[in-house]
From Swiss-Prot:
Name of the featured protein: tRNA (guanine-N(1)-)-methyltransferase
Keywords assigned by UniProt, alphabetized: Cytoplasm, Methyltransferase, S-adenosyl-L-methionine, Transferase, tRNA processing
Biological process, per Gene Ontology: tRNA N1-guanine methylation
Keyword S-adenosyl-L-methionine found: yes
Native organism: Oenococcus oeni (strain ATCC BAA-331 / PSU-1)
Known partners and oligomeric status: Homodimer.
Superkingdom as given in the UniProt entry: Bacteria
Pfam families recorded: tRNA_m1G_MT
GO CC annotation: cytosol
HAMAP family reported in the protein's UniProt record: TrmD
Binding, S-adenosyl-L-methionine: G113, L132, G133, D134, Y135, V136, L137
């Protein structure tokens, strides 16, 4: 996958070159480049922003540097600008499903803004607008990094274990069940016995039930978006009964 980023703070993306993503870059699984669109300004002061027409607080990113930077991206990629993403609070909310969809593109280009916002004409370059949530950051760099990190996890051979992404929270519409490692007893806190007895079917059922329980208690909204088989419905009935007993104590 080719990933281009347009930003006036390219050094902020250096952490993405570490850990698993860094290894994926080294292996050639990801071609990652950040373009400083300040380099494409035409004014002497190298300003990338200007005042808002009609008045108003703050400054807006001007279209010219970003349009010219995008032309450079196209030139470097044989006319391909990629699937262009504008990171903006007004975009659709980012989630697991969006990340998985983005991972199917061969080329992604992120426009990471700053200041008060963008000249609206910049949106003529954009294929999709994405938001991390109902809050505003000082710039789009952090949001772009989150989206990139979550997306590339779905690429083949990026994660060390091919099952890691498949087992993540949200992969099957549920939160991941509680997990444990050695020792089996730590300061009197015991790993559930079912996980140590070697019965794979019992372990599967425990994991499914505890995944449902965790989702029921912490993110019940996820259950509203999901269909269930009979086993899951039976587990949910058990969970609701067990939790009602706990709340009465």
């Amino acid at each position: 996958m080719k990933i281009d980023v347009l930003s006036i703070f390219p050094d902020m993306f250096d952490p993405l070159r570490q850990s698993m993503i860094g290894k994926a870059i080294e292996k050639g699984l990801i071609d990652f480049k950040v373009t400083d669109f300040r380099e494409f300004t035409t004014n002497k002061q190298r300003h990338v922003d200007d005042v808002v027409y009609g008045g108003g607080a703050g400054m807006l990113l001007m279209p010219q540097p970003i349009f010219d930077a995008m032309e450079e991206v196209k030139k470097e990629n044989n006319g391909d600008k990629g699937h262009v993403i504008l990171v903006d609070p007004a975009g659709r909310k980012f989630d697991h499903h969006v990340a998985k969809k983005l991972s199917t593109y061969n080329h992604l280009t992120f426009i990471s803004g700053h200041y008060e916002g963008y000249d609206n004409r910049i949106r003529n370059l954009v294929d999709e607008e994405i938001s991390l949530g109902d809050y505003v950051l000082t710039g789009g760099e952090l949001a772009s990094m989150v989206i990139i990190d979550a997306t590339v996890r779905f690429l083949d051979n990026v994660l060390g274990n091919s099952e890691s992404a498949a087992d993540d929270s949200f992969q099957n519409g549920l939160l991941e069940e509680p997990q444990y490692t050695r020792p089996a007893n730590f300061r009197g806190i015991q790993v559930p016995e079912v996980l140590t007895n070697g019965d794979h079917e019992k372990i599967r059922k425990w994991r499914l039930k505890e995944s449902l329980r965790k989702t029921f208690l912490r993110r019940p909204d996820l259950l509203e978006k999901r269909s269930f088989n009979k086993e899951e419905l039976d587990f949910l009935d058990d969970i609701k009964y067990e939790e009602s007993l706990d709340s009465d104590q």
